[in-house]
Design a protein with these regions (language model features):
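A structural "hinge/loop" feature
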Residues: 111-136, 144, 155, 239-248, ...
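Extracellular/periplasmic solute-recognition and catalytic clefts
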Residues: 200-206, 220-221, 310-323, 347-414, ...
Length: 691
């Protein structure tokens, strides 16, 4: 196989991995909401929201999926910088822009050449909402494209495989600098790998993507000051999408760190007495706690960063402000250093409802996170009336907006766990849910009742049978299944009883933010009551929900499935070995079993073991085999109802974008998902305000 053919194969892999939103399957036509189904908020819902705008399909590349090097920028003498930075240069506080940029800057193309200045006003719900900050900075060596169909260079100048995809070499841009002006080099990647990943105090277990099939560690070595080589025991065809989900904004998944700054907080480098004093002064117990605190760019404004904007204060404050990085590596095609906007300000709101009111009033310049689809009619009305903003609907790669997931390793009540580990019980729950009602009431008629798999048109799509399996509203079938399990006795309120006399039921945890989790949960609870299943709906804040998830304390949860298009890379929700924080609560102790080599935790059932085996095979598989593997996993997933999907293919989960009419270059069509770090894949450093 020659080099060109090999790279074509890699391109195909990426196209398979990220479903193009312009697939042949059109979005379902929204049906009008029935009068009897009230909107989940007090806002009127006179019309159904249109389906999300599909992003155009990207043609398959003829060579590599992303350019091995970015196009050359303007000559150094022709670079321009923002007026506020030019003033600092004039005052002798900053070097000229040509000296701050790398020799070969990242060149970003957008519909318009922008204007400098302005503050991007956004909202957030405080520290528990930090993923919204991570998405904006999208602080990685590479990143996903606007349509999610490919991976593009960012801080890296090139990422190159060998002919067998067992070696990948990352080359950085010569002359790149951290926000404090210090060089950004291969040593910053090596510090992350040698001193964080391989330090058991900081990271007890090595991330699975850095392990070979036999459990040995992937070899990571410095080639020169700008290059680092990763060597795998077998072909690693998913390296690009994997590292696209490793960004320094996410303290759990960085891939580079400012060694020159963080060494003072690391036990391998710092003087012990000095480090002990720093720990004591911070009122912490260990150096590892201090290290993680100082590594967090949203909680430590002194941390040097590579992102377009850098923190000026802590994100626990009422207004969290990020200011332009004078050393950012990007320019536009005219040689203007990016970003265009001077600042990003995140205003704290006590809840999502208050944030939505601010968006409706036109107080936020671009906001998709926490925006409720239920408010779409009001937003459209205000869009026409005030003329302050435009509303875009961004699409996803598939999945579902709010599924019900049972914890199959819950320990506190074995009788309850035994009940919901029965597949027939989960089938009964699924058949009892009236998805068409949820579609109309919660999602304004958009999307479709479905399971959380990839959307039609992808080579990974296993077929309609699995997209819609168990999604029919069949309360009679649900009752028959429950009767067949022996739950025939009922109490005075009509709830079925277990042999012990306890009610057949479970506690369901839902977070009142991001998507429509609570609205969906409330309707599902009412449906399940009709077949005799008692549900204790607990509405919890995100931090507490996640703490309980990690502690194996959740019985069941409502969450979305947003990794259908990136099943084999990043913190995919289709692999129980992923960190529990970012995964779903199928069985936290299954992960423990894998982490300890079977010495602790709970041994997974055969289907889960099969999924794990398939996941491992996919990392080195050819494109056609990857498609087969994806289909096999989706089938196992649905057949066993590990995630009971409700409705998918809507803009509900961070796809309703409110955009100031004066803010230009914001993509009207954008593929959104957590893996893509939306809106970060929309290149926000190119967005600008028209004066």
């Amino acid at each position: 196989m020659n080099r060109k053919t090999t790279l074509r194969l890699l391109s195909m892999i990426l196209i398979l991995a990220f479903v193009l939103t312009g697939c042949s399957q059109p979005a379902p036509t929204p049906a009008p909401a029935p009068p009897a189904a009230p909107a989940p908020t007090t806002a009127p819902a006179p019309t159904a929201a249109p389906a999300p705008t599909a992003a155009p399909a990207a043609p398959a590349p003829t060579t590599a999926p992303a350019p091995t090097a970015a196009p050359a920028g303007a000559p150094a003498s022709k670079y321009n910088d923002a007026p506020i930075l030019a003033e600092q240069v004039k005052a002798g506080k900053l070097p000229p822009v040509g000296e701050r940029l790398p020799q070969n800057p990242l060149v970003l193309y957008a519909p318009e050449i922008g204007q400098y200045g302005g503050v991007w006003h956004r909202g957030f719900l405080g520290p528990s909402d930090r993923n919204g900050l991570i998405r904006v900075v999208n602080d990685g060596l590479v990143r996903f494209s606007i349509d999610g169909a490919s991976v593009e260079m960012k801080y890296a100048e090139s990422v190159t495989p060998n002919a067998t995809f067992t070696e990948w070499t990352i080359k950085l841009r010569k002359g790149s600098k951290w926000s404090d002006g210090q060089p950004f080099t291969a040593d910053d990647i090596m510090f992350w790998y040698n001193d964080v990943v391989n330090n058991k105090d900081l990271m007890p277990s090595v991330p699975s993507w850095l392990l070979n099939k036999d459990g040995s560690k992937v070899k990571v070595e410095k080639v020169d000051d700008l290059s680092v080589k990763f060597t795998f025991g077998a072909a690693m065809t998913l390296f690009l999408p994997e590292i696209a989900q490793k960004d320094a904004g996410d303290k759990n998944y960085p891939m580079f760190l400012p060694a020159h700054y963080l060494k003072q907080f690391h036990a391998s480098y710092a003087n012990k007495a000095d480090l002990d004093k720093l720990v004591a002064d911070a009122k912490l117990k260990t150096w590892t706690e201090l290290f993680y605190l100082r590594q967090d760019q949203f909680d430590n404004p002194d941390l040097p960063v590579m992102s377009a904007w850098m923190a000026t204060n802590r994100y626990s404050e009422q207004i969290f402000t990020m200011r332009r990085n004078p050393y950012y590596v990007g320019v536009d095609k005219a040689g203007n250093q990016l970003p265009y906007m001077d600042e990003v300000q995140f205003k704290f709101f006590a809840d999502a409802a208050a944030l939505n009111l601010a968006a409706i009033a036109g107080e936020l310049d671009e906001q998709e996170r926490q925006i409720s689809l239920a408010n779409y009619p009001v937003l459209k009305e205000e869009e026409a009336k005030s003329g302050k903003y435009k509303i875009y609907l961004w699409s996803s790669t598939g999945g579902d907006e709010a599924g019900i997931i049972f914890n199959l390793t819950y320990k506190k009540d074995p009788e309850l766990t035994a009940m919901w580990t029965q597949l027939d019980f989960r089938k009964a729950v699924s058949y009892a849910i009236n998805r068409p009602e949820i579609q109309q009431s919660v999602f304004l008629g958009t999307g479709e009742p479905r399971m959380g798999i990839i959307k039609k048109g992808s080579p990974w799509y296993p077929g309609d049978e699995w997209a819609y399996k168990y999604t029919e509203f069949k309360p009679d079938e649900a009752n028959a299944l429950l009767d067949g399990l022996g739950y025939t006795k009922r109490d005075s309120e009509g709830y079925r009883l277990l042999p012990s006399g306890k009610r057949v039921g479970f506690e369901l945890s839902a977070v009142p933010a991001l998507g429509a989790y609570v609205d969906v949960a409330q309707l599902a609870v009412a449906d399940l009551k009709k077949v005799g299943i008692w549900v204790d709906l607990q509405i919890r804040e995100r931090d507490l929900h996640f703490q309980m998830r990690e502690a194996n304390d959740l019985q069941a949860e409502v969450w979305n499935q947003d990794s259908a298009g990136t099943m084999f890379s990043g913190s995919t929700k289709f692999d129980i070995r992923m960190p529990i924080y970012g995964n779903l609560t199928y069985g936290p102790l299954f992960k423990t079993w894998y982490d300890t080599g079977g010495k602790d935790g709970v041994e997974p059932p055969a289907p889960w073991k099969q999924i794990v085996t398939l996941q491992d095979e996919a990392k080195s598989a050819a494109p056609d085999r990857q498609a087969q593997i994806a289909q096999e996993i989706f089938k196992l997933w649905v057949d066993n109802l590990y995630d009971i999907g409700t409705v998918g293919l809507t803009a509900a989960d961070q796809g309703v974008a409110v955009v100031n009419v004066k803010l230009h270059n914001v993509p009207e069509s954008l593929t959104k998902d957590w893996a893509l770090r939306t809106p970060g894949n929309g290149k926000p450093e190119t967005w600008f305000f028209v004066k």
